[in-house]
């Protein structure tokens, strides 16, 4: 799929520096910038001897990827969310690029459906790379949670909208999946049945290998409003 649309809000140009390409073999633990804001999710790198400054006018390569996602990188592959098309043809896409050359290696797209997301607010979360296998996880604004191998083979996907009832992400603010041992954890505002009937922001934990639900939780009390 060729992405040709760009906008002042959504056109993202990736500035790639030499130190982002990592060549660790997949048989070894995966190293890199594996999740939103890095290894400790605090925006800092554990790498040594990094450049003091980066010249934005001299990138190794650029790629036009509409969206507000940020890239994750491992073993020479860069993964990022974006979107393509308009109206009923709009799809959110996860794209894998060669971190050294910017060449597109693979891409998967999911159509939007029953979403209250405003245009240009798609693809706000980041993919997450599982450190043991290099598998990649994504969460879309339409409620799709999906897992892929580093080479782009789909392991599983799940439509949370269809399984867990009404689902929304205010202003398109989806979660970047979190890997915790054997679980992949995400969240969304849902309304279903029984204890999870009332609308609320809930966490969902799935088996990272199969996509089967392990637990769901609605922490804290529902917000209240008082008028005096």
Positions of PLM-derived features:
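N-terminal secretory signal peptides that target proteins for export/translocation
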Residues: 1-9
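Bacterial N-terminal signal peptides
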Residues: 10-23
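Noncatalytic, solvent-exposed loop/strand surfaces
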Residues: 26-228
């Amino acid at each position: 799929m060729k992405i040709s649309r760009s906008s002042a809000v959504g056109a993202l140009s990736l500035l790639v520096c030499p130190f982002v390409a990592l060549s660790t073999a997949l048989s070894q633990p995966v190293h890199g910038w594996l999740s939103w804001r890095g290894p400790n999710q605090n925006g800092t790198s554990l790498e040594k001897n990094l450049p003091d400054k980066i010249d934005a006018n001299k990138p190794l390569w650029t790629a036009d990827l509409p969206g507000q996602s940020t890239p994750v990188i491992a073993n020479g592959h860069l993964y990022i969310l974006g979107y393509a098309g308009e109206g009923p043809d709009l799809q959110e896409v996860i794209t894998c690029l060669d971190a050294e050359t910017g060449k597109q290696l693979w891409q998967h797209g999911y159509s939007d459906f029953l979403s209250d997301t405003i245009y240009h607010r798609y693809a706000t979360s980041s993919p997450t790379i599982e450190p043991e296998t290099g598998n990649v996880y994504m969460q879309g604004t339409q409620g799709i949670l999906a897992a892929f191998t580093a080479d782009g083979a789909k392991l599983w996907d799940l439509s949370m909208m269809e399984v867990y009832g009404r689902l929304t992400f205010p202003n398109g603010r989806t979660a970047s999946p979190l890997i915790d041992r054997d679980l992949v954890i995400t969240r969304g505002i849902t309304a279903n049945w029984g204890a999870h009937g009332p609308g609320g922001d809930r966490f969902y934990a799935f088996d990272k290998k199969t996509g089967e639900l392990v637990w769901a939780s609605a922490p804290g009390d529902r917000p209240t409003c008082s008028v005096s």
